[in-house]
């Protein structure tokens, strides 16, 4: 957790919106649920090689978990750590249920109509991510399985998935320590399993600050032996990159 968090940048992502930024390694990304009940769908890419992106199966498999929370790392498909979860007030981050598409949102909340609703339209998470990644030359084939921050989806003994309404409370914070230069892509569109009667517009505040150097007793480094190997992959990647730039 960042005890002396001094933001270099702060922004507010309105509900039903999308946002992205390349965040350099050595920074902490703080995400705050402003009103409670937010959902923040997230994708990660290597801005220097956009073919490298967040890999959900490897992230879960190597850490032997279905959920993510404080102490977990977020892996690329090259076995490197994009980010470490150093704070999670919610205790559970959804990893498997993805985003809603146009039909899902229309069936649940009605057709979107930008002509009349403008920026208060009923956008869906899939199209929102597509719009944002297109800014970097990416498209449909580049939309991988995403995370849903501030959202909890659990399973029962028979394997049925259950959405927890209002899992995140107003003011809840999740902090990600960025371990390599990372393109972060967000959308605040509602979760596909959200049972709300009316389309929920829930904003999320984003802040970026310098991160303290990782110590040997770091919770993310030590939560799984596999994470040590992930950080070693990062070290070798940055070692090679530094050689090539000198």
Task: Show the residue positions of the predicted features.
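Intrinsically disordered, low-complexity segments enriched in small/polar residues
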Residues: 1-246
């Amino acid at each position: 957790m960042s005890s002396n968090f001094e933001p270099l940048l702060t922004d507010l992502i309105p509900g039903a919106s999308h946002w992205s930024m390349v965040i350099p390694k050595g920074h902490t990304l703080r995400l705050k649920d402003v009103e409670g009940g937010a959902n923040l769908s997230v994708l990660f890419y290597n801005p220097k090689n956009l073919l490298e992106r967040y890999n959900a199966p490897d992230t879960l498999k190597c850490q032997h978990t279905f959920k993510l929370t404080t102490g977990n790392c977020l892996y690329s498909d090259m076995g490197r750590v994009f980010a470490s979860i150093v704070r999670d007030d919610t205790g559970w981050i959804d990893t498997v249920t993805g985003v809603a598409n146009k039909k899902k949102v229309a069936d649940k909340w009605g057709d979107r109509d930008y002509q009349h609703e403008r920026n208060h339209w009923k956008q869906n998470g899939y199209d929102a991510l597509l719009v944002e990644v297109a800014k970097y030359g990416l498209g449909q084939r580049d939309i991988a399985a995403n995370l849903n921050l501030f959202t909890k989806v659990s399973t029962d003994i028979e394997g049925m998935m259950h959405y927890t309404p209002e899992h995140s409370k107003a003011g809840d914070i999740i902090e990600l320590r960025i371990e390599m230069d990372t393109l972060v892509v967000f959308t605040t569109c509602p979760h596909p399993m959200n049972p709300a009667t009316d389309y929920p517009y829930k904003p999320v505040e984003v802040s970026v600050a310098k991160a303290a150097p990782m110590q040997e007793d770091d919770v993310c480094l030590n939560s799984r032996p596999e994470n040590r190997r992930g950080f070693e992959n990062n070290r070798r990647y940055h070692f090679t990159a530094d050689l090539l730039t000198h």
